[in-house]
Amino acid sequence: MNQGTTSTNFDFLKEHDPLFVELAASAERAFASDPNTTLIKLRQFAEAIAQHLAARSGVEFDEQTSQADLLYRLNRELRFEPVVRELFHTLRIEGNKATHQFRTQHREAMDGLKIARALAIWFHRAFGKAGSSFKPGAFVPPKDPSAHQRQLQ
């Protein structure tokens, strides 16, 4: 994997699918210049995780299946804990807002990155080789260019 597709916050997902790391790393790289794109990429990240889970568990879907429908089917089959269901739905909803409203604050994108990381950690603990003993380390936030501006206010 080249330097452009690494992410200290998500590298542990390489074990599952390089696409997961690529999408998460793209979201992180976009953060400073385009927080809106960060949320769109994070929605795609959650979609990739959901599709992976569906394929793994035999839940049928195709390109016409909405993320909401896929999550409903997955929840019926896998019985997600409420917090996991909420992680998926928050990334879906915030990604939709970013796609259709065109404005995202850095604070919202940072929240999205933290939510995506929580989903990634759940996924890795549930399906990774390390299992529940996986220790992810601290979240490393990307630099927030609006933080300085907020301090001045």
Which residue stretches match the model-derived regions?
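Amphipathic alpha-helical interface elements
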Residues: 1-153
